[in-house]
C-alpha cells in the first residue's frame, strides 16, 4: 500500500499527486472512460462546483496539469465517476450547514487490489485534515 501526503494548497497538492503518478508511468487515459453524456453532464455541473466547492476545482486543475492532461476531460471523468456507475455498492452523503459543506463517500475496497491502494494523509493549508484509503489507478 502506498502512503501519499497531500499538503500545501489544493492546486499544489493535486499537481504533486498527478505528477508523481505520471513520473511513475501512471498516465491515465481519461478519454477512454468518457462519453458524450458524461462530457455534457460535466459542462453543466462545473458552475456548481465553482460556486460551492472551488477548492476541488483547483485540485483537479492541479492534478490534470501534473498528469499532462486536459482539465475538461479529467473533470468530466471525476464529476461523473459515481453518477454514471450503476453496479457498485458505494455510498455518498453530503451535508451543508453554517460550518461548511461536508462530503463523504465510501468506495468498496477489494483486498485483492491492496497493492493499488493509497493511504492518504490529506493535510492542506486550509480546511479539515483526514486520513483515508483510495484506490490507485
Feature-to-residue mapping (PLM):
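N-terminal mature-domain region immediately after signal-peptide cleavage
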Residues: 1-137
Amino acid at each position: 500500500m502506498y502512503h501519499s501526503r497531500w499538503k500545501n494548497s489544493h492546486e499544489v497538492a493535486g499537481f504533486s499527486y498527478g505528477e508523481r503518478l505520471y513520473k511513475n508511468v501512471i498516465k491515465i487515459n481519461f478519454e477512454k472512460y468518457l462519453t458524450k453524456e458524461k462530457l455534457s453532464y460535466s459542462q453543466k455541473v462545473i458552475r456548481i462546483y465553482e460556486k460551492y466547492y472551488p477548492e476541488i476545482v483547483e485540485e483537479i486543475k492541479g492534478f490534470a496539469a501534473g498528469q499532462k492532461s486536459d482539465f475538461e476531460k479529467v473533470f468530466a471523468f471525476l464529476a461523473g465517476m459515481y453518477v454514471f456507475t450503476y453496479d457498485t455498492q458505494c455510498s455518498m452523503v453530503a451535508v451543508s450547514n453554517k460550518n461548511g459543506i461536508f462530503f463523504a463517500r465510501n468506495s468498496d475496497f477489494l483486498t485483492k487490489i491492496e497493492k493499488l491502494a493509497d493511504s492518504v494523509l490529506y493535510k492542506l493549508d486550509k480546511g479539515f485534515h483526514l486520513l483515508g484509503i483510495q484506490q490507485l489507478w
